[in-house]
Swiss-Prot record:
Binding site for ATP: 231
Keywords on record: Aminoacyl-tRNA synthetase, ATP-binding, Cytoplasm, Ligase, Nucleotide-binding, Protein biosynthesis, RNA-binding
Gene: tyrS
HAMAP family on file: Tyr_tRNA_synth_type1
Annotated protein name in UniProt: Tyrosine--tRNA ligase
S4 RNA-binding domain span: 341-405
Length: 407
């Protein structure tokens, strides 16, 4: 079996690592336990977590054991990384519910049977810490001068950084130490924005335990313009089908820019690299084949083959003009009483768009269509005249479709 390090390197996941030669040798000759942390601030994972899941799956396929650490304890503080404001603190009940949702989603591509992967909650050890003991055992190993040079803190110093958040790096470092002691976890993985926190944990284990520990970060999923992928007009692209339907999920990947196809095929599918290279070499109209494969493969991973097939059929029916096969399109249901209300109100009420202001903005920009007719009047009222045999068809931009059915 080839070394998983080489697989991760070839597919373009790896951004930074602490000890390159040692890590490659370790992954080639031993089966290790490693961990990735998940911040339970929502009840669903989103596309921003997708790379972490893929790396975990590649590592597990090579015989290594993933530990999914949910931050039930740190989530009650909030990670300052990449944030300009202090996060809202969450209740234990919210965090526990979110953790359960995460495990169901992770289990779609990670095997949790027979301890092949485990999920742990850092609340188990953080919430009962003795503050004095923690300062004496852990705090003594952290230099404030060094911490202040970390990017996650530098960007917050001018606007204000609470002592609560300043402790986050110590907590994350302590997580790694606890996992090392309990599960012989020797490596922490994460997005490149976690580099400073990962280094802190590696250094803590080497100081406290006089043992080797390693860290690796991977690239963030960005498009050719450097912007994070996974954002839509309706907000984040969620992995929960109740928040982002399989059809919308499929359509997002079907419509990525030509320049992003190769990167997405490498990073978020398990297609062999020879097939990735073949699909990525297609040009002109043929690149659509690669986009269809990408959309199907990614949707299959998250929602299963049946839902991926339904989304594919719905998308092809739409572009082929066959509106009889659109049962899998995102559909909102309203009462007859809801007619004779403004389009803007209904779009917000049906959650087709996140707000009335977003609906108005789209109309002003000429990007909203009802039954394939451009909407030019912000005050347009939907009436029975707009209801066709298949409902009211809403199009946002060129390729985002929804249907409103009157019951």
């Amino acid at each position: 079996m080839s070394n998983v390090y080489d697989i991760l390197k070839e597919r373009g996941y790896i951004k930074q690592l602490t000890h390159e030669e040692e890590i490659r040798e370790l992954l080639g000759k031993e089966k290790i336990s490693f961990y990735i942390g998940f911040d339970p601030t929502a009840d669903s994972l989103h596309v921003g977590h997708f790379l972490q899941m893929m790396v975990m799956a590649h590592m597990q396929k090579a015989g290594h054991r993933p530990i999914a650490l949910v931050g039930g304890g740190t989530g009650m503080i909030g990670d300052p990384t990449g944030k300009t404001d202090m996060r809202k603190m969450m209740t234990k009940e919210q965090i526990e519910y979110n953790c359960n949702c995460f495990k169901k989603q992770l289990a779609k591509i990670i095997d949790f049977s027979e301890d092949k992967a485990i999920m742990v909650n850092n609340a188990d050890w953080l919430l009962n810490l003795n503050y004095i003991e923690f300062l004496r055992e852990i705090g003594v190993h952290f230099s404030v001068n060094k911490m202040l040079t970390a990017e996650c803190f530098k960007s917050r110093l001018e606007k204000g950084l609470s002592f609560l958040e300043f402790n986050y790096m110590l907590m994350q470092g302590y997580d790694f130490l606890e996992l090392n002691r309990k599960y012989n976890c020797v490596m922490e993985l994460g997005g490149d924005d976690q580099w400073s926190n990962i280094l802190a944990g590696v250094d803590l284990i080497r100081r406290k335990e006089s043992k080797s520990a390693y860290g690796m970060t991977f690239t963030l999923l960005t498009n050719s313009e450097g912007k994070k992928m996974g954002k839509t007009e309706s907000g984040a692209l969620w992995l929960d089908p109740e928040k982002t339907s399989p059809y919308e999920f499929y359509q997002y990947w079907r419509n990525v820019a030509d320049a992003d196809v190769e990167k997405c095929l490498r990073l978020i599918t398990f297609l062999p690299m020879d097939e990735v290279r073949r699909l990525s070499s297609l040009e002109g109209a043929e690149i659509n084949e690669a986009k269809r494969v990408l959309a199907f493969e990614v949707t299959k991973l998250i929602h299963g083959e049946e839902e991926a097939q339904k989304a594919k059929v719905a998308a092809e029916a739409l572009f082929g003009g066959n509106v009889k096969d659109l049962g899998n399109m995102p559909t909102a249901y309203i009462d007859k009483d809801d007619l004779n209300n403004s389009l803007v109100d209904l779009l917000a009420k049906c959650e087709i768009l996140p707000s009335k202001s977003e609906a108005r903005r789209l109309i002003k920009q000429g990007g909203l269509y009802v039954n394939d007719e451009k909407v030019t009047d912000i005050n347009l009222v939907l009436t029975e005249e707009h209801v066709t045999e298949d409902g009211i068809m809403i199009r946002r931009g060129k390729k985002n479709f929804n249907r409103i059915v009157v019951e």
